[in-house]
Each structure stands twice: as structure tokens, then as C-alpha cells.
């Protein structure tokens, strides 16, 4: 089964774009989809979320490493 499902990251969209509280569901999905994030970063639909200034804050709050995309 492919764990990459950007729709599951919906709980992260608000905090990624506007800041504010990060729900536990967001951290759970970021953790589950860590291997997918670089693909999203390259995508025209989702790249702005991953590259947004608030994204680093999400990873910090969730205690996850920032994805290092090549």
C-alpha cells in the first residue's frame, strides 16, 4: 500500500499556511508520510505547503526532522 496520500495531510494545511495550533493528527500524518514529503515539495499543488516558512515550525512542534530534498 502506498502511504502517500496528500489528502491525509489536511490537518496540517491551516498551520502550514497561517500558523496557529498544530493538531496531533497533523503530526501523526507527517510522521507516517515522511518518505512522501519531498515528492510533495516538487509538486505544483502541494509544494507551497512544504516550502512555506511555517512548515519548519510544524516539523519542530512534531519533533520530526525537516525533509532534506535533493
UniProtKB/Swiss-Prot annotation:
Paired cysteines (S-S): 4-38, 12-26, 27-62, 36-69
Lineage: Eukaryota, Viridiplantae, Streptophyta, Embryophyta, Tracheophyta
Family: Belongs to the plant LTP family. B11E subfamily.
UniProt-listed GO biological process terms: lipid transport
UniProt function note: Potential phospholipid transfer protein.
Any one Pfam family match given in the protein's UniProt record, by short name: Tryp_alpha_amyl
UniProt GO MF annotations: lipid binding
Recorded superkingdom: Eukaryota
Alphabetically ordered keywords of this record: Disulfide bond, Lipid transport, Lipid-binding, Transport
Gene3D superfamilies: Plant lipid-transfer and hydrophobic proteins (1.10.110.10)
Protein name: Probable non-specific lipid-transfer protein 2
Matching CDD domains: nsLTP2
Organism: Zea mays
Amino acid at each position: 500500500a502506498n502511504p502517500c496520500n496528500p489528502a491525509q495531510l489536511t490537518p496540517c494545511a491551516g498551520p502550514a499556511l497561517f500558523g496557529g495550533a498544530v493538531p496531533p493528527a497533523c503530526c501523526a500524518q507527517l510522521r507516517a508520510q515522511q518518505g512522501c514529503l519531498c515528492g510533495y515539495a516538487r509538486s505544483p499543488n502541494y509544494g507551497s505547503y512544504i516550502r512555506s516558512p511555517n512548515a519548519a515550525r510544524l516539523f519542530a512542534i512534531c519533533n520530526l526532522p525537516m525533509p532534506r530534498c535533493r
